[in-house]
Amino acid sequence: MSLTFYWYPKCGTCRKAKKWLEEHGKEINEIHIAEQPPSKEELKALYEKSGLDLKKFFNTSGMKYRELNLKEKLYHMSEDEQLELLASDGMLIKRPLTTDGEKVTVGFKEDQFEENWA
């Protein structure tokens, strides 16, 4: 089973996650999240499969998030507007974003990876 792995190569957390997946023998399809962010439709599908709050998909520690003052603005945006915004700039998306087409993880927590991808 191949995993789709949206990542940013300069991100330390992404590199740790990639190393974990490789050490566990996972075949990964790497996609540079800033150069090829998922489309709005892809994000909607990932969000629905994840069972997470859509706000968990935002990179809240990113410069772009802070520049746009999204902490305040997200509460006033519809789900559709939030998905549109995420699709417009891969740097707004919390990374890495990993999926096998059924399960989805956002970010890298070893216990979540163990539970989903081991």
Curated annotation (Swiss-Prot):
Alphabetic keyword roster: Disulfide bond, Oxidoreductase, Redox-active center
Domain of life: Bacteria
Signal peptide boundaries: none
Similarity field: Belongs to the ArsC family.
GO molecular function: oxidoreductase activity
Matches recorded under InterPro entries: Arsenate_reductase-like, Thioredoxin-like_sf, Tscrpt_reg_Spx/MgsR
Record-annotated disulphide pairs: C11-C14
Protein name as it appears in the record: Uncharacterized protein YusI
A Pfam family reported for this protein in Swiss-Prot or TrEMBL: ArsC
Organism: Bacillus subtilis (strain 168)
